[in-house]
């Protein structure tokens, strides 16, 4: 199966078992996202690395990966709308999320960026690149395909989150057993608890109601055509990037390469950060 994936991508599929203005694009974002910008001395041609988190997350989720590059690159980390400390909105789709990030890029007068996005953040990064390809030098997508996903894959998660909202616990310790009644995965429970906020009406920093109401938009995808050099990093045990979809991926991203990390799932950046860092470094060093 690996060799089939290689041939379809027509480039090397690495397999390790060891070891961020198109004049015609009108940006409608009215509020700036919450962001942290770590700037280092660099030449004018060195792009800024922008890290974009996934669903239910925040800017800290890719922090370990970002820190590995902070000595030689300026780093921009953001909270997407309805996440972290960014603004809440009833509307949410990839056009809007991409425009939000582009607004921050323009606010900071960045001329060249490298986008690194995980899951929903990966789709946002792909949409940004499609809207403003002249801004993006390279694109790195962690465990996400440019494909629509069918069904309601986070039903247990939403059930647990709404159960917490209805129960109004006073702290994480009280919220945990409520979540565990619906969510069997301890890692997912701990991930959700990171965003617990007793002062929020939803009991979480993310906008639970908006995420639920816009879930179909988050799972959806409109085809693009992007020639930017792109790296897809796949968790070996994850089904978000499927070998049988490689031709459809290449139709949208003809300059894509792929890298799989065995023994890891959808949160590959948290499970095997050293491998993800190594894959990104190798991709960034390619001319």
From Swiss-Prot:
Family classification = Belongs to the DmpD/TodF/XylF esterase family.
The organism sits in which domain of life?
Bacteria
Q: What class of enzyme is it?
A: hydrolase
Q: Kindly give the InterPro entries that the UniProt entry links to this protein.
A: AB_hydrolase_1, AB_hydrolase_fold
UniProt keyword annotations, A-Z: Hydrolase, Serine esterase
Q: Coiled-coil intervals in this record?
A: none
Its Enzyme Commission number(s) read 3.1.-.-
Per its record, what are the GO molecular function terms?
carboxylic ester hydrolase activity
Protein name according to UniProt: Putative esterase/lipase HI_0193
Q: What residue stretches are annotated with the AB hydrolase-1 domain?
A: 47-273
List, from the UniProt record, the residues annotated as the active site of this protein.
119, 266
Keyword match Signal = no
